[in-house]
A protein has these predicted regions:
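Condensing-enzyme catalytic core mediating Claisen C-C bond formation in acyl metabolism
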Residues: 1-47, 151-226, 230-233
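Short beta-strand segments
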Residues: 6, 79, 110, 135-141, ...
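Acidic, glycine-rich active-site loops and adjacent beta-strand->loop/helix elements
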Residues: 10-11, 79-84, 111-116, 139-144, ...
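Conserved catalytic cysteine-centered active-site region
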Residues: 32-53, 81-135
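Generic recognition of short, well-ordered alpha-helical segments
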Residues: 57, 89-90, 149
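Phosphate/pyrophosphate-binding loops at sites that engage ATP/ADP/AMP, CoA/4′-phosphopantetheine
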Residues: 58-74, 231-234
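Structural signature of cysteine-dependent C-C bond-forming condensing enzymes
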Residues: 65-74, 99-105, 127-141, 172
């Protein structure tokens, strides 16, 4: 028995912001962005387009390639830091409804940049444990809406879009996902976070504030390089 990635699909917003345009907004240059990040451009969702909209578009493409009908899905997992709604309902439930995948399990997963990897691991494990057939794994973000466009250390890095994968449990041996390694380092949580209202209690009433991304770029970079090297060797 194995779990395979049967197909993938993407949603790339039409609006494209090249480095040359970004260099007119903040104190940076096209060459600096390219040399430090390797990014040439980022795509931005149009006004009114939600995370679930991008997720659904990517999902439809993946399902069509796989030849799997939405009603055949047993599970939908959406990894996102920018859900349609804070708290609930889950964006995965909205995606389920828009696809017509009635009856499937559906939930969101939040793990930042590693969200899709976590979602793929969780979904494949659930397919094996529950002896289910098909799952839809989606990573979707509308990060441009929480980026501080005056902060060059973060606005150069993030954009919008979605990717989806249909994964399936098969009886054939010698194929499929081989292994995965997951981990976290909670001590660095505040090196990359959303600036929000300070609250004494989780749901204490407070004045609304649009959250913005804050990042200690050097620490995040050092951690990523060190950790990826260790994980690859494992």
């Amino acid at each position: 028995m194995a779990v395979i990635i049967r197909s993938t699909g993407t949603h790339i917003p039409e609006r494209r912001m090249p480095n040359s345009e970004l260099a007119t907004l903040v104190d940076t240059t096209e060459e600096w962005i390219d040399s430090h990040t390797g990014i040439g451009a980022r795509h931005l969702a149009a006004d009114g387009v939600l995370t679930s909209d991008m997720a659904v578009d990517a999902a439809k493409k993946a399902l069509a390639k796989a030849g799997v009908e939405p009603r055949e899905l047993d599970l939908i997992v959406v990894a996102t830091a920018t859900p349609d709604y804070f708290g609930f309902p889950a964006t995965a439930c909205i995606v389920q409804d828009k696809l017509g995948a009635y009856g499937s399990a559906a939930f969101d997963l939040g793990a930042g940049c590693t969200g899709f990897i976590y979602a793929l691991d969780v979904a494949s494990s659930m397919l094996e444990a529950r002896k289910a057939r098909h799952a839809l794994v989606i990573g979707a973000e509308a990060l441009s809406r929480i980026v501080d466009w005056q902060d060059r250390s973060t606005c150069v890095l993030f954009g919008d879009g979605a990717g989806a994968a249909v994964i399936s449990r098969i009886e054939e041996a010698g194929r499929g996902l081989i292994a995965s390694v997951l981990g976290a380092e909670g001590s660095g949580a505040m090196d990359l976070f959303l600036i929000q209202e300070e609250r004494n209690a989780t749901f204490e009433r407070a004045a609304p504030l649009v959250p913005k991304i804050s990042m200690n770029g050097k620490k995040v970079y050092d951690f990523a390089v060190k950790t990826i090297t260790v994980l690859v060797k494992r």
